[in-house]
Amino acid sequence: MEKEEKDVKRKEIRQRIGKRVAVLRKFAGLSQEQLSETAGLQRTHVSRIEKGRYSLNIETLQAIAEALGMTVDIIDPGLQDLAPLKRLTP
């Protein structure tokens, strides 16, 4: 796969996850500010994630899932293999 194709695929993944985070956050009745506080993130990060402009690492994804009261596979079923993982610590 060429670099351009990989970049497009990554962008699509970021956008898909971002849209899902936004839908689930709203369904939970949370503002971006509330989600960011609960997940330990800056509100601007939550905004960028929801717009598909921020690449998530597993720790951030796990923090968002926990703040929403769910597992990462609910955010994106393609991530089901990550669902059993707990937040990673160095």
Task: Please report, for each region that a protein language model flagged, where it lies by residue.
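Conserved hydrophobic/aromatic packing and binding residues within compact polymer-binding modules
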Residues: 21, 35-36, 46-49, 75
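A short, Lys/Arg-rich alpha-helix, primarily the initiator
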Residues: 2-27
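DNA major-groove recognition helix of helix-turn-helix/homeodomain DNA-binding modules
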Residues: 59-74
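Recognition helix of helix-turn-helix/homeodomain-like DNA-binding domains
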Residues: 40-55
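Short, charged recognition helix plus adjacent turn
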Residues: 2-6, 76-90
